[in-house]
């Protein structure tokens, strides 16, 4: 296991609870004589911190590990910037759900100490890369750890499009949109739209139509190395949008093509040794607990 000396900290802005947790984390790391580097945006609202700062884009180059304090959305944003550097990422949950941010604030010192002592698991999560092309030229590009979503934007009208997988025509469709999700994203927007839960170790992509105009239209799970192409109908009278993790947005025009494929770099996500994916699902999704008197 790697032993970490240079620790980066990213914190969600706009929350006093996050700031309090960042201060505790900073104090704990410094007491262990580690080199702490703050992302510049959180550093601006921590006057007198006396630490090295870095942009999020460069943080992965100067750190052995980055700790994200916030919710799953905070970690999604960090993942897109850090995956290219192959730097491990650990999440401390200050959000509402916490599928990706494992550690509770009240156990910060104990659990982070275990990680620093080499007691942790590393899970590789792949990202998607999306590109919007118009008349053969790229007009927008983005990465996503959860999902790439084609949606109507501010319009209430349906989108008409064609779907191709690895160059093979699959179908044309009228729907409110289309969700292309990783296993990580299968418990997010795709789940709300009726998609399946996929274990994070699966090398697969799920394609989930949003309110399709055909009862036979169902989610499709394809190989993780597939290349998807979505062609917006030339007869459309609206300009739909493509969103990556709900954070980066591109506007499409009729006739545009969206390609989605696996990104080469992966996110290295750190978990405590006792991390249990099914326990996370059971807790976060409200599944039934063990029956009384059941076996171990």
From Swiss-Prot:
Chemical reaction(s) catalysed: NAD(+) + ATP = ADP + NADP(+) + H(+)
Enzyme kind, highest EC tier: transferase
Main localization category: cytoplasm
Transmembrane segments: none
Cofactor needs: a divalent metal cation
EC code(s) of this entry: 2.7.1.23
GO BP term, pick one: NAD metabolic process
GO cellular component, one term: cytoplasm
Binding annotation for NAD(+): 72-73, 146-147, 157, 174, 176, 187-192, 247
Keywords for this protein: ATP-binding, Cytoplasm, Kinase, NAD, NADP, Nucleotide-binding, Transferase
Gene Ontology MF terms in the entry: ATP binding; metal ion binding; NAD binding; NAD+ kinase activity
Source organism, top-level taxon: Bacteria
Gene3D superfamilies noted in UniProt: Probable inorganic polyphosphate/atp-NAD kinase, domain 1, Probable inorganic polyphosphate/atp-NAD kinase, domain 2
UniProt key word Signal: no
Pfam families: NAD_kinase, NAD_kinase_C
Localization annotation: Cytoplasm
Active site: 72 (proton acceptor)
Protein function: Involved in the regulation of the intracellular balance of NAD and NADP, and is a key enzyme in the biosynthesis of NADP. Catalyzes specifically the phosphorylation on 2'-hydroxyl of the adenosine moiety of NAD to yield NADP.
Stated family: Belongs to the NAD kinase family.
Protein name: NAD kinase
Organism lineage: Bacteria, Pseudomonadati, Pseudomonadota, Gammaproteobacteria, Pseudomonadales
């Amino acid at each position: 296991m790697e032993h970490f000396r240079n620790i980066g900290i990213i914190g969600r802005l706009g929350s006093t609870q996050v700031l309090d947790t960042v201060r505790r984390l900073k104090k704990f790391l410094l007491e262990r004589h580690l080199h702490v580097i703050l992302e510049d945006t959180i550093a601006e609202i921590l006057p007198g911190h006396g630490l090295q700062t870095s942009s999020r884009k460069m943080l992965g180059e100067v750190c052995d590990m980055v700790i994200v304090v916030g919710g799953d959305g905070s970690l999604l944003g960090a993942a897109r910037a850090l995956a290219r550097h192959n730097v491990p990422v650990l999440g401390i949950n200050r959000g509402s759900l916490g599928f990706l941010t494992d550690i509770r604030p009240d156990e910060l010192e104990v659990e982070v100490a275990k990680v620093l002592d080499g007691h942790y698991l590393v899970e590789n999560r792949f990202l998607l890369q999306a590109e919007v092309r118009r008349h053969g030229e790229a007009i927008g590009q983005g990465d996503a750890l959860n999902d790439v979503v084609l949606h109507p934007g501010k319009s209430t009208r349906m989108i008409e499009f064609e779907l191709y997988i690895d160059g093979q025509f699959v179908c044309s469709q009228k729907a409110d949109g289309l969700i292309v999700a990783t296993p990580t994203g299968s418990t997010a927007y795709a789940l709300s739209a009726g998609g399946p839960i996929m274990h994070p170790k699966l090398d697969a992509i799920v394609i989930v139509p949003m309110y399709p105009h055909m009862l036979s239209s169902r989610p499709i799970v394809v190989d993780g190395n597939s290349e998807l192409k979505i062609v917006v109908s030339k007869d459309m009278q609206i300009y739909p949008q493509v969103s990556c993790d709900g954070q980066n947005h591109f506007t499409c025009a009729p006739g545009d093509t969206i390609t989605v494929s696996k990104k080469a770099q992966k996110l290295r996500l750190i978990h405590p040794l006792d991390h249990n994916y099914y326990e996370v699902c059971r807790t976060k999704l409200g599944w039934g607990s063990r029956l009384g008197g059941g076996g171990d």
